[in-house]
Structure formats: structure tokens, C-alpha cells
Amino acid sequence: MRIFNPLVTLALLVTQSAPVQAADLNGAWTIDASACGQIFTKENNRLSFKKDADLHAGGLIVQGKQITGTFEKCTVKSLHDDGATMRLIASCSDGVSISDVAFDLTFSGENNITLSSKAPVPVQMPYVRCPM
């Protein structure tokens, strides 16, 4: 049984009521804004995870069509804007297997999103963009 992965969730980043652009998704995202400094680092203008990032709130790094979590990497295959919600399909690899994953993304401000999945279990996760 596949569990909802927050890594794929980050790929759904878009500004509310605006056309989706790859640049809108770029950045470091987490469920706990106060943990940004414990999760992410920026060296030579590149974002990366700190060594023990998975021990804190966890998060996602979006760079173009690439979405990286602490245990999984995804490539966005498609984004479809349905008005208030955006539908994202990504091909994700955990190092062992590759699978396509679908998520819905809702924006609640410039730096806040909610990612949701209906299968295998309905899940909603709010994310905030870290100032990096």
C-alpha cells in the first residue's frame, strides 16, 4: 500500500487565480515555517537539505520541474489549472521503484499552499515557502 508522500505535494505550487509558471513553484517548502533553518541550506545559490532534515518537519525543494524530498525525487509531468485548484501529475522515484502520483494543489496566499491526495487515503497537508 502506497502512503501519501509530501514530496509530491510541493509540485503543486501556484499563485491563486494565476496561470501556473515553473518559477511560481521554485523554492524550499515545509509544513513548519519555524523549522526552515533546521531543514534547508543554501550554498552557491543552490538549495539543499541539511543532514538531519528528516528529523524535523521535513519538506520539499522545487527547482523547475524537479521536486526533491528527503527520500524521494519527482519530475512534474503535467500541471492542469482547474480554477481554484491545480492538478499535478509527477513521476516519482524512491530509489527502488518509480510511480506516477497525482495531487491537487490549492493556494492560500503567495507563500502558502495545501496539497491533497484522494488515494489511497484522503490527505491534506499545508505547506509554507521558506525565505531562502
State where each predicted segment sits:
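N-terminal signal peptide c-region/cleavage motif recognized by signal peptidases
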Residues: T15-S17
